[in-house]
Amino acid sequence: MQLNSLGFPRIGRRRELKFALEKYWRGESTQAELHEVARELRRTHWQWQVAAGIEQVPVGDFAFYDQVLTLSATLNAIPDRHRGEGAIDLDTLFRVARGRAPTGTDAPASEMTKYFNTNYHYLVPELKQDQVFSIAYEQFFDEVAEAQALGYKAKPVLLGPVSYLYLAKTVGQDFDKLSLLPNLLKAYAEILARFAAQGVTWVQLEEPILALELTHEWQAAISESYQALKTAQVKILLTSYYGSISHHQALVSALPVAGLHLDLVTAPEQLALFANALRPDQILSVGVVNGRNVWAAEVDLIVERIGSVARDLCSQDGSRLWIGTSCSLLHSPVDLEVETTLAPTLRQQLAFAKQKLLELANVRQLLQAPESVAAKEIVNTCLARREAKAQAADAKVIARVAALTPADYERVSEFTERQAVQQRKYRLPLLPTTTIGSFPQTPAIRGLRSRWRKGELSDAQYTEQLQQVTRDTIDRQLKLGIDVLVHGEAERNDMVEYFGEQLEGVGFTKNGWVQSYGSRCVKPPLIYGDVSRPKAMTVDWAVFAQSLTDKPVKGMLTGPVTILHWSFAREDISRDTIATQLALAIRDEVVDLQHAGIGIIQIDEPAFREGLPLKQSEWQAYLDWAVNAFKLSAAGVVDETQIHTHMCYSEFNDTIAAIAAMDADVITIETSRSRMELLNAFEDFEYPNEIGPGVYDIHSPNTPSVEAMVHLIEKAAQKVPVRQLWVNPDCGLKTRTWDEVEPALKNMVDATRELRRRLG
């Protein structure tokens, strides 16, 4: 009974890779020094895995930027603009990812987008109609040799051919990506032959698209691919993750592969279905430890769930069952051992990547020797952990959720009635101008926060300094002539962490970093218990800012769905229950802001779409509870209080009904890069509420002209009635400088005034 590691985080437990990359990019180290850091990380991570009982270490999970990009380089699928004169090398990959590198000519970076429904981002392969695939980069093979030289048995892991094509985009002429499959399969066959020549036994080919609802053409591509690769002199472990593949069971079970890996964390019900169809010569790898979360596995319950199938397989041949993580541990922080300041009650609930390896060994221990002393200790630990969790439950929060009624989710009046009341109260001009919330987080502001956290500034000194920043932010907006102001969020380091630090049931780590892309790492909050708000979180800052002007200043909050999706959320209750608890906490803040005289309140939901399940047939169930969570957070106010929300997506057509159901008085969205084409969804749906389509791209340092913004506002007015329109940037301005922000906002206000003159 082997233990199966699908992949391990590459960043290092103290983000060693991040710092080495950035040092190299700044020109402060050599490529040889960067490679040495990478080798040491791989060596350490392999050592940990072998020490935990992993017999075949994953190789190919390490990447200097992104594993999909590494595969593109291996396949010679690099855009021409990034190639340079010589062979593909590491700097080539950096030019693809970042648009520049220490060597070579700068060129626009490739597109980056989220990997399925995770918060990890991959570089989208760009494929031409005449694309020729061939081995052009040696990293995979070099690392196999490196592992073998250290005495380890290597199991290469790489994205399968069909998922690779699915994730790619076509460039140049419009054509069917699947027309490239035959040539791609020849390259994959060559890769597998190279692995075989190195003495590799097993290769993990990942086809995460199996968790999607695939068309007939893509299903046929799966079948064609693995028929073509069946002659390889290596054993293929066909690997799925992020969801059930039971809807493709007949297809998958017929494939000529030596083994199959199932994600039993997201879809435990598929075990029996595939186990019953397993051929006598196949192995089954069961992904039972969650690779995407931080919570200690309930090992005893896992064994209860898989026990009968496991015993049946092992009675035939003990080597036919592998115990694995649900997916790569890439999505988990590296090592709990470096967390020295966590409360013991929270620490005992956690397992990071290194600890999850030991959990695999614990599952095997319970399966093989359930009566042993070690097994009984494992069970007792699980029981004690669950008992502690039960004792920590907040009865008041649970009772409050249980007592909710349908009326708690609805505003007092319909939108048209609220709109009339709000227009009389605020008397805003046609095309009111506003911003999305944050203003530049200058080095001075970051320095203040750092000194305060170190104890070099008292709370009073810190508050006084930030009040001066807020005065300046309000003053700048008044001089620009913006209609609805914001306080600028100088006191906030992160839009989720700021709220999480003030909520009961939410904790934070010092080193719980996970890779988002390249050298960018994030440290998500831990929602470990029932969530409540012990006291007001933003009211003082909103009231202070409002005291500086007669113009309305928006209260700024992060919505419950976004806080949930950007956190590691507990697994012992449903995600919709957690969202409801968060919504009640935000609702309390909304009500307090209203009572303090803040009449316009924005509840941001940038991650609303990120929670959509991979299978479209499951979308509605998610949208129902996500919409309800937002409505619950916003519904406790009177008609005069205007609720805004902000979303930044590239697609609205398939969720426009849900967005309308949220019933925000005003929604601001990211549209400038699409030249307002995204508004087609709102036009076709006849979206009833007010909308602020972004009129300039805040991600660019360029100053948009008055004429360009006039044109965009006019385009928007062709799609949405002008009296429903607001004017605003695409997103928050936190990452820009004041030298960039002020000219852009001045032009935005001037463009709006020009249109008001034209429209009378």
Curated annotation (Swiss-Prot):
Give the pathway listed in the UniProt entry for this protein: Amino-acid biosynthesis; L-methionine biosynthesis via de novo pathway; L-methionine from L-homocysteine (MetE route): step 1/1
* Binding annotation for 5-methyltetrahydropteroyltri-L-glutamate: R15, E16, L17, K18, K114, R520, C521, W566, E610
Residues at which L-homocysteine binds: I436, G437, S438, E489, D604
Do you know which Pfam families this protein is assigned to? Meth_synt_1, Meth_synt_2
Protein residues bound to L-methionine: I436, G437, S438, E489, D604
> For Zn(2+), which residues are the binding ones?
H646, C648, E670, C731
Reaction(s) the record says it catalyses: 5-methyltetrahydropteroyltri-L-glutamate + L-homocysteine = tetrahydropteroyltri-L-glutamate + L-methionine
Enumerate the UniProt keywords alphabetically: Amino-acid biosynthesis, Metal-binding, Methionine biosynthesis, Methyltransferase, Repeat, Transferase, Zinc
Question: Which InterPro entries does its entry note?
Answer: Cbl-indep_Met_Synth_N, Cobalamin-indep_Met_synthase, Met_Synth_C/arc, UROD/MetE-like_sf
Q: How is the cofactor bound?
A: Binds 1 zinc ion per subunit.
- Report the top EC class in one word: transferase
Any one Gene Ontology MF annotation carried by this entry is:
zinc ion binding
Q: Name the cystine pairs.
A: none
In the record, biological process GO terms are: methionine biosynthetic process; methylation
User: Active-site residues?
Assistant: H699 (proton donor)
The cofactor named in the record is: Zn(2+)
| E.C. designation(s) | 2.1.1.14
The residues forming a coiled coil are none
- Family listed: Belongs to the vitamin-B12 independent methionine synthase family.
Cite the NCBIfam families for this sequence: met_syn_B12ind, PRK05222.1
Relate the protein's function as given in its record.
Answer: Catalyzes the transfer of a methyl group from 5-methyltetrahydrofolate to homocysteine resulting in methionine formation.
Name of the molecule in the record: 5-methyltetrahydropteroyltriglutamate--homocysteine methyltransferase
What is the scientific name of the source organism? Shewanella oneidensis (strain ATCC 700550 / JCM 31522 / CIP 106686 / LMG 19005 / NCIMB 14063 / MR-1)
